[in-house]
Swiss-Prot record:
Entry comment on modification after translation: Two-component system major event consists of a His-to-Asp phosphorelay between a sensor histidine kinase (HK) and a response regulator (RR). In plants, the His-to-Asp phosphorelay involves an additional intermediate named Histidine-containing phosphotransfer protein (HPt). This multistep phosphorelay consists of a His-Asp-His-Asp sequential transfer of a phosphate group between first a His and an Asp of the HK protein, followed by the transfer to a conserved His of the HPt protein and finally the transfer to an Asp in the receiver domain of the RR protein.
Encoding gene per record: RR6
PROSITE patterns, sorted: RESPONSE_REGULATORY
Free-text disruption phenotype from the record: Dwarf, narrow leaf, low tillering and sterility phenotypes.
Listed name of the protein: Two-component response regulator ORR6
UniProt xrefs under SUPFAM superfamilies: CheY-like
Induction and repression of expression: By cytokinin in roots, shoots and leaves. Induced by infection with the rice blast fungus Magnaporthe oryzae.
Amino acid sequence: MAAAAQAPAAAKVVVATSPRAGGGGGGGGDRKVVPVVVAAAAGDEAQSEMHVLAVDDSSVDRAVIAKILRSSKYRVTTVESATRALELLCLGLVPNVNMIITDYWMPGMTGYELLKRVKESSQLKEIPVVIMSSENVPNRISRCLEEGAEDFLLKPVRPSDVSRLCSRIR
């Protein structure tokens, strides 16, 4: 029996946020509800098994990368920060992630810091991480690749970049 195409599902997740600098160790972070968008591409079920977590603080860049990934028949979850991505991954709220594509420079935790945390985690270290940036800084690119990034893409990301990555990761 063929599965029907699914519309993007919106879930709401309650997460704890840590206090800013000077907050001390009192354990009191605020809690807030954060929407998480998961979109499955219609069509080929075998390809839609590929699940990509796209992380970028820019809503425009998130929409662009999600559109490119969906046009290649991949399921996409988008989040606005590396901190949120790590929380959702560690809590198992975005299951079966095959790849993480993250912006390098974001407020709070950077994409580089997310890369390091993923690679240090016994639970997450096998997930390929791709870094994106609009800045072509050779030592930054080298550092990310040395820390275990699968690739470093310059923005704007093109469909050919995504096709190349996904063919290597399958």
